[in-house]
Amino acid sequence: DLVRSRGLGDVYKRQAPKNCIFTTNTSYMLASMFAEDSGRPEKFCAFHFHDVFYSRVVDIMPHPHTDPTLIPILEDLGRKLNQVPVLVKRENPGYIFNTMLMALIGAAGKLLTGEVASVEDIDRSWMVNFHMQMGPFGILDSIGLDTAWHVTHNMTDRASVAFAALLKTYIDQGKLGEKTGEGFYKYPNPAYRNPDFIV
């Protein structure tokens, strides 16, 4: 939420020491959108963690006015936190991995809303072909359907609009994925974790 982020920036810039580096963990808002509000845009950079229980990647994404000397400092911090730092050289909503992930999720959503295949068969196809433990809909349940909806509901292409509408029906029923016990699958024992899911 951009307004809330701007309000926090006012508090931080008054209380933080002058040499303090400000970072944001936002997933889709660009640091340049609120860098000026930090009061120190040259000391502001995106430092984005993925789910630390599953991933060790931290994205470092400077905005055009970030002091380049911050990059090695943040890379070193990432390594000290047992993360693998990746540098996003140009601002991009979704960084690197989330951009690729949303392409996968978008394709899976298009297949489902176009009635090309079922949730289970879309996931099976992905899991078998790439030797993965879950497919796109299992991933969506892990991310949270509400989170996925926040990303997709402003997209304007026909497939994204249809998929956002489908996600909203789940959200309206309180089915947000793994965190609520049900999304595209039921938890704690979703079908894709059963040995007979892929036969």
Where are the regions a protein language model picked out?
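Rossmann-fold dinucleotide-binding core
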Residues: 20-89
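Short phosphate-engaging motifs
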Residues: 30, 104, 147
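Single conserved hydrophobic/aromatic residue that forms the stacking wall/gate
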Residues: 1-12
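Helix-to-beta-strand junctions that scaffold the AdoMet/dcAdoMet cofactor pocket
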Residues: 16-17
